[in-house]
Amino acid sequence: NASSSLQIRGATSISASNDPLVVIDGVAGGDIRNLAAQDIESMTVLKDAASAAIYGTRGANGVILITTRKGAGEAGRAQVTYDSWFGVNLAKSGPDILSADEFRRSRRATDYGYSTDWYDLLLRDFSYDNNQYLSIDGSTKNGYYGASFNYKKATGLDLNSSREEFGGRFVLNQRMMDGIVELNGSLNARRVNEVWGNDGMFDTALSMNPTMPLYNEDGTYFQPTSPTGARNPVQELKEIDNNGQRVYLLGTAEVKVNLIRSEKQMLNTSLSYSLHYNDLKQHY
């Protein structure tokens, strides 16, 4: 479940971030991963220094301008969109290693009398991706409105990894007093629940004696005797909870006052907030 990264010009620093600046509806510092793909109306990449100069040093790695969808459709009539897809992932065959019988014939170590495919035991039969999206858009003679809701769930091919997302977005534009006052607002919120597996257990599984049992006779997990301190990889995946929660908020609010046609007074503010929480528990 490693986080993805995005680069425009390639790596320019060893220690500092190489990610471009993401500007969502005029708010700098957003994260493209926190938007539903269906909510994006347009995307522009500023690659040259001149175009990105307005953002100062923050735009040194390039700038991505994202405009999200606004309310649309015939005035007085709501437009409802529903998008759904589901995918299944299957693991390819594992690496070619000695079977239990081949291991016995090689006489490399103690024969415990079992035939255990440690690598296969770390894998699910399949994993899946589930994405659901619902939006409601509309317009009136004085403005527009829009709301969308998104749910994603994905599991990894290893026994203990998954990612679940809940997202919502709301946008509103309203003109009042014969167009003298105009209100604009938007709010994007997303919560992500993640469970991380341990890729290192696959390396452990490849080095395990395939004649060892998964369980002891009393039902407890068998533990190998190893000078390297290696433990039962299945137990490590099943009995260690390594999870995290992410909360993201991105909002804008704007008031425009047009008292004089040649002049326009405007007050705007924006909010960008993120909370990261990690929890590690060991149940043995």
Locate each region found by the language model.
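Extracytoplasmic beta-strand/coil segments of soluble accessory domains associated
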Residues: 1-25, 41-42, 52-72
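Transmembrane beta-barrel architecture of outer-membrane proteins
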Residues: 3, 61, 129-133, 165-169, ...
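Short strand-turn segments of transmembrane beta-barrel domains in outer membranes
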Residues: 4, 20, 76-93, 109-135, ...
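Short beta-strands and strand-coil junctions in structured, solvent-facing domains, enriched
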Residues: 13-15, 29-31, 49-54, 71-75, ...
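Residues on the lipid-exposed face of transmembrane beta-strands in outer-membrane beta-barrel proteins
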Residues: 68, 82, 99, 134-138, ...
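Short loop/turn motifs that connect adjacent beta-strands in outer-membrane beta-barrel proteins
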Residues: 71-78, 141-142, 177-182, 260-268
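Membrane-embedded beta-strand positions of outer-membrane beta-barrel proteins
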Residues: 80-84, 147, 183-185, 253, ...
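Flexible loop and strand-edge segments within Gram-negative outer membrane beta-barrel domains
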Residues: 86, 91, 129-150, 154-161, ...
